[in-house]
Structure formats: structure tokens, C-alpha cells
Design a protein with these regions (language model features):
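A structural boundary/capping signal
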Residues: 1-157
């Protein structure tokens, strides 16, 4: 198993356990995990991968049939695709057989469905106070949410 697959699987398991225990009730969007959590999840996964010296960028793509719907996943410097929330589309946009709960490797059907107007964006740094962007060098609302969620899942990693 690759380092990317090990870390992605470990994070997905931690998120599933925390969600199953109701620990995300007050942390939108994680209260609906994996639905609507792709971008925040990528921030956390990007942080964990960076801890292992694996640099990633987020790929943010629009749905080919409705550009108001978007999905986000990671791509490493070597071009490896990592997506641990594509199962949110199972039974709706994708057949169950086309979904991997932890995708590490090539693009799958989910990424192909969200291929319109793709944008590369950096991961949000939430774990380094030198990177806080709100007034008085405090974490911005997104960074605060990521800090809160990471504290919840850290015990399951």
C-alpha cells in the first residue's frame, strides 16, 4: 500500500468513525459527511500528506451538466489523484460500481463528471498560526472550522 493510500484510508476511517458517533453534529458541513465536505476534507488530507512530504493541490471542478455543482479532490506533484468523498455521488450521479470510497491513482468517473471549468487551488493552512489570515493574526472562519474538526478526528487517526 502506498503512503498516499495509507494516509487517505486512515483519514477516511477516522471521519467515518467520528461521524458515526455523532461528533460532527455542530460542525457543518461535516455533520453530513461525506456530503458537501470535499473541500474541507481535502484541506485536512493535504495537511496529513504534507506531514509525509507529499505536496498536493486541490482540483475544483464543475459538474458537466450543471456548473453550479462542484467537487474537489487532490492531485499530488506526481499526478496521483486522491479523493475520499466521491461516494457522496453514489446512487445519484454515479453507479455504486463506479465509486471508490478511497480513490488513489487515476481519475475515476466522479472526477470525469466534474471536469468542467477546473481550477487548481491551494490547500487551506489551518495548523500554522503564522498562516492565520483574520484580524489580529487569528484564524479565519474556515481555518477555525478545520481546527475544530481536526481536534475531533485526531483521536481516531
Amino acid at each position: 500500500m502506498t503512503v498516499e493510500k495509507r494516509i487517505a484510508t486512515k483519514l477516511r476511517c477516522a471521519l467515518d468513525v467520528a461521524h458515526g458517533k455523532g461528533e460532527f453534529v455542530k460542525y457543518w458541513p461535516f455533520s453530513r459527511f461525506p456530503y458537501d465536505c470535499c473541500e474541507h476534507t481535502c484541506d485536512i488530507l493535504g495537511y496529513l500528506l504534507l506531514e509525509e512530504n507529499i505536496n498536493t493541490i486541490q482540483i475544483n471542478g464543475a459538474y458537466i451538466k450543471d456548473p453550479t455543482r462542484r467537487h474537489v479532490w487532490l492531485k499530488t506533484e506526481k499526478g496521483v489523484i486522491i479523493d475520499i468523498t466521491e461516494d457522496q455521488f453514489a446512487g445519484e450521479l454515479l453507479d455504486e460500481k463506479d465509486v471508490e470510497i478511497v480513490r488513489v491513482g487515476m481519475e475515476g468517473q466522479a472526477q470525469k463528471l466534474f471536469s468542467k471549468n477546473r481550477v487548481e487551488q491551494p490547500n487551506t493552512v489551518f495548523n500554522d498560526s503564522r498562516e492565520y489570515t483574520d484580524f489580529g493574526n487569528c484564524p479565519n472562519p474556515r481555518q477555525k472550522r478545520l481546527i475544530e474538526v481536526f481536534k475531533v478526528i485526531e483521536k481516531y487517526l
